[in-house]
Amino acid sequence: MEETKDGWVPDTTLFCFDRNRNIFVGAVNIRHYLNDKLLKTGGHIGDGVRPSERKKGYATAMIGLALNECKRLGINKVLICCDKDNIGSAKSIINNGGILENEVEENGHIEQRYWIQL
């Protein structure tokens, strides 16, 4: 696979929708491989949950589904990063087997880097 000229890599986006309440809950993006920038900060998976739906387990579930898709794509070791201050994201990553490797600082911002072996 080849990186595009603008630095983007191929990706897959999955959406979480609550059919019972007819609302969009969140989304998770899976980057098929990492370029140098994503290896430092960003990682394979990024997710977002609607503010009104946070702290309900959706992020943990979405990351779990994304990890299944990573396995299907042949990604055996997955990097997921989050803001050091985002305790909820860190818990969702850890609940899916994430192991903190380190923290990196970029432009005054500290990001935690977690790896998950599939």
Question: What residues fall within each predicted segment?
Answer:
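Conserved acetyl-CoA-binding loop-helix of GNAT-fold acetyltransferases
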Residues: 46-49, 55-72, 91-95
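Loop/helix-junction capping segments adjacent to catalytic residues or to phosphate/diphosphate-binding pockets
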Residues: 39, 56, 87
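Conserved GNAT acetyl-CoA-binding A-motif
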Residues: 70-81
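GNAT-family acyltransferases
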Residues: 1-44, 69, 107-118
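Conserved beta-strand-loop-alpha-helix junction that forms the acyl-donor binding cleft
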Residues: 80-88
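A short, internal acetyl-CoA/4′-phosphopantetheine-binding micro-motif in the GNAT/acyltransferase core
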Residues: 17, 32, 44-55, 83
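Conserved catalytic-core motifs of GNAT/GCN5-like acyltransferases
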Residues: 81-82, 94-113
